[in-house]
C-alpha cells in the first residue's frame, strides 16, 4: 500500500520533469474487453501455435477483472494530466488499434515533411482524457 501511494505521488513529478526537459511523453493504455480477453485466453489454450503466449497471469486477470478495472480507473484519475495525458486504445481489433496509435503519434509530433492526412485517428479507438470518460472504457 505504501509503495502504491508513493508511486502515485512520484509519477506526476517525474512526468513533469521529463516534459519540462523537452521529452514528448505519450502514455497509452491498451484496453481489451472482457469478452475479447476470454476469447484470446481460450485461443491460447487450444491453438498449439499460440500456446507460447500463455501465462499464469491470464487466468488471474480474468478472475480479478473488476479489481484491475477499478485500479486502472483510479490510476487514470491520479495520473492523467494536461502535460502528460493518457490515451486509451481499444484493442479488440489489433490491426485497427496499431494503425490508430501510429496515426495518433504522427499527428502529435512536429514533423513538417509528414503528410498528416494519411494518419487519421478514430476517436472510438483512441480515447483521450480517460479520467473524464470512464463510462466509455471497457468494464
What are these regions (language model features)?
Residues 1-10, 18-70, 116-124, 133:
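A glycine- and Lys/Arg-enriched "phosphate-lid" helix/loop adjacent to the NTP-binding pocket
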